[in-house]
Each structure stands twice: as structure tokens, then as C-alpha cells.
Amino acid sequence: MESQKEARTLQEPVARPSGASSSQTPNDKERREGGAVPAAAALGAEADDDSADGLWELPVEPAERRPECTRCSRPQKVCLCPFLPAHPLHISTHLYIIQHPAEENKVLRTVPLLAACLPQDKCKVKIGRRFSEERDPELSTVCRKSGTLILYPGAEAANLEEFILDSPVYPSTIIIIDGTWSQAKDIFYKNSLFRHPKQVQLKTSISSQYVIRMQPTNRCLSTLECAAVALSILEKNNYIQETLLRPLQALCSFQLQHGAQIRLSKEHLLKNGLYPKPMPKNKRKLRKMELLMNSVKI
């Protein structure tokens, strides 16, 4: 069959008009198999191609970013500064945010709001995936201090509230990783520097108010919420948590008023048969989904 087709093709060559597209519609193909293409059709195809080629020559203007507020990093039309404290909160704890590079340019990120509420010398953001003593000697020094904690859940993590009651050295610094859960896991386990600080976690039953972004489970909190709870515990001041959550609440409220939808956790969607995507074939990912459905901490 293939040889017959090749022979027929060689015996009946079809001339393509200059400038015609190499792609063929079904009608083009039928006309070509029946004989020569009519002159009017050929001219029409050539004219269409010429006009399409002209579109590629039109100048393209780069999209302009909306002017951003220098304090909250939000577009000026939706500035959240009215919901920020008039002056940075007075805290004694140093906060280090280890931010995955993919989070840096996300529109609805929470770290700029957090940084806008705190003194610059108390809140530092380090962007990257790999850190070492050579690359970041400051962070290396911080990680080796006895008063430094790193907030990351796990079997070896102590509950923050219980830890500070028995700790001989009261914590002076806390490190929080900013990124998706898979990104945070990658940063935590692939940087040996983060083995030095005491690992702690939050023992809280509150649900995330960051409802415009899907979380893996009902117990997961955004970076801003984690910092708000942790700082209120370390500073023994609940007003800190209330103040830090105010701009986050305003952000979510504004987005919901302008078309955003409440994003339920993946755990909730799976348990209620609402998860829109097919279950993964990868055994490791499938096992993770099963743990979420059974409310097992992962």
C-alpha cells in the first residue's frame, strides 16, 4: 500500500502556489487529489497567507506592569496600606524568611505584607533553594546560634509553646520557609544548615484564612499566618497575631469581591469526592492522596 501511494504521488505532482501554506484543510486535500487547484482558490489562499504574514510584522508593545505601592507591594489601585499598622510592630525576635524563587513574583504572595508590618532589622528575606556557609555566611552564623529555631512540622519537631517553657535559652530568632509544601520540603531537607536550629512546629487548631489559595490540608497555614502565630507566642502578645492577619483578611476579601473563588483544601475535596483531577498513577503520589483522604498527617 505504501509503495502504491508513493507511486501515485510521483505520477501526479501538484504545484503549490507561491506563498501558500503547507498545512491543508480537508477540502484542499480533496481538490488536490481530484486534479489542479482552481485559480480563484489558489489566489484566495495566497491572499489569506499574505495577510496572515503581515500580522507577524505588526509591532508588539510590551505589557506594562501596574504601578505598585512601595510599602505593601500591591498595585496602587488595590493598596493594602490602610490595613497595615501605622508603625512597624515592636518585637525582639528576629525573623528570617527562606523564600523559594518561584514565590518571589507570585501576585498573591503574603511575605511582602508580613515584611511591611515588621521592622526591617527584625525581618529578613533570603531568596534561593540552596544555602551554604560559603554562599551565605550570615545565615550560617544564625543557624548555629543556640537561640535559633526553624519552623517546620515533623516527627522530630517540638511544639513551640511547650518548648519555650522548658528551654534554658529563650529563642531569639525563628526561621520560616516560604513556598509550596513540596518546595519547602526540598529546601528543608537539602540544606544541611537547617539541621542546626531546633526544629519546632505549631500546635494549633485554627483554619487558614488564606482562602484564595488551595492548601494541602485543613491544618495548613500560609507563611504570614505561621509567622503571626509564632511571633505572638514568642513575644507573648496576641495583638501581634491580630495585626499581622488584618492585611491578609483584607487581601482575601478584596479578591473574593472581584471574582476570586474560595479554594477548599485538597484534603476536603478528596474526602468529599470533589477533587476535579484524576487520581495520580504514580504510587508515591497516590499514597500521599490516600493519607490526605484519611486525615493522616503528612
From Swiss-Prot:
Its EC number is 2.5.1.25. InterPro entries: DTW, DTWD2/TAPT. Keywords: Acetylation, Cytoplasm, Nucleus, Phosphoprotein, S-adenosyl-L-methionine, Transferase, tRNA processing. Residues 35-45 have a biased composition (Low complexity). GO terms for cellular component: cytoplasm; nucleus. The gene is DTWD2. This is tRNA-uridine aminocarboxypropyltransferase 2. The keyword tRNA processing applies. It catalyses: a uridine in tRNA + S-adenosyl-L-methionine = a 3-[(3S)-3-amino-3-carboxypropyl]uridine in tRNA + S-methyl-5'-thioadenosine + H(+). Catalyzes the formation of 3-(3-amino-3-carboxypropyl)uridine (acp3U) at position 20a in the D-loop of several cytoplasmic tRNAs (acp3U(20a)). Also has a weak activity to form acp3U at position 20 in the D-loop of tRNAs (acp3U(20)). Involved in glycoRNA biosynthesis by mediating formation of acp3U, which acts as an attachment site for N-glycans on tRNAs. GlycoRNAs consist of RNAs modified with secretory N-glycans that are presented on the cell surface. The modification N-acetylmethionine is found at M1. Belongs to the TDD superfamily. DTWD2 family. GO terms for biological process: RNA glycosylation; tRNA modification. The modification Phosphoserine is found at S132. The keyword Nuclease does not apply.
